[in-house]
Amino acid sequence: MAEKRNIFLIGPMGAGKSTIGRHLAEQLHMEFFDSDHEIERRSGADIGWVFDVEGEEGFRIREEKVIGDLSEQQGIVLATGGGAIKSRETRNKLSARGIVVYLETTIEKQLARTQRDKRRPLLQTEEPPREVLERLAQERNALYEEVADFVIQTDDQSAKIVANQIVKLIGM
């Protein structure tokens, strides 16, 4: 089996994937990508607009394509969107093309980290944020665990400390 040279960060919104990913890439001298930012770059529109115009299904199609393209590269750190693992194709590509690290966090931390963020379409609904996050956790946690090579709890730890833990875990 070829050595896995990419690192893919998965987990719910507010777990710290983007922030931790930047620290990790810097520490390992790897290129960092955020799938949501790449979707925005390619579409010329922000995520909220994509959700408004194309719905979640249209967004997920774009996300699957972006992650498929990026994961073909070597030597990258990729922070995925929280729902990226809903796609079996995406889960298979992540597993086959790199080391998958599930950044786990509590609902309380997610609420604290996302409460002022208006750029999260799934939280911009009439449904209370706690209920949304609990529902998403029920739908997704088993999928995160299925694809993860490693699981790291991010609550009450700085992004730099979590990045250091990842480096030790994966032996890079």
From Swiss-Prot:
* Cellular component aspect of the GO annotation: cytosol
Q: Per its UniProt entry, which superkingdom is the organism in?
A: Bacteria
Class of enzymatic activity (EC top level): transferase
Q: Where in the cell is it found?
A: Cytoplasm
Enzyme Commission identifier(s) = 2.7.1.71
Pfam families xrefs = SKI (PF01202)
GO BP: amino acid biosynthetic process; aromatic amino acid family biosynthetic process; chorismate biosynthetic process
This enzyme catalyses: shikimate + ATP = 3-phosphoshikimate + ADP + H(+)
Q: Name one GO molecular function term.
A: magnesium ion binding
Binding-site list for ATP:
14-19, 120, 157
Keywords, A to Z, come to: Amino-acid biosynthesis, Aromatic amino acid biosynthesis, ATP-binding, Cytoplasm, Kinase, Magnesium, Metal-binding, Nucleotide-binding, Transferase
**UniProt pathway:** Metabolic intermediate biosynthesis; chorismate biosynthesis; chorismate from D-erythrose 4-phosphate and phosphoenolpyruvate: step 5/7
Give residues annotated as binding substrate. 36, 60, 82, 140
Q: What is the UniProt remark on how the cofactor binds and its stoichiometry?
A: Binds 1 Mg(2+) ion per subunit.
Q: Where does Mg(2+) bind?
A: 18
> Which cofactors must be present for this protein to function?
Mg(2+)
Q: Its quaternary structure? A: Monomer.
Q: Which family does it belong to?
A: Belongs to the shikimate kinase family.
The function of this protein is: Catalyzes the specific phosphorylation of the 3-hydroxyl group of shikimic acid using ATP as a cosubstrate.
Which PANTHER family does this entry report, sorted A to Z? Answer: SHIKIMATE KINASE, SHIKIMATE KINASE 1, CHLOROPLASTIC
Q: What is this protein called?
A: Shikimate kinase
Native source organism of the sequence = Aeromonas salmonicida (strain A449)
Which gene is annotated as encoding this protein in its UniProt record? Answer: aroK
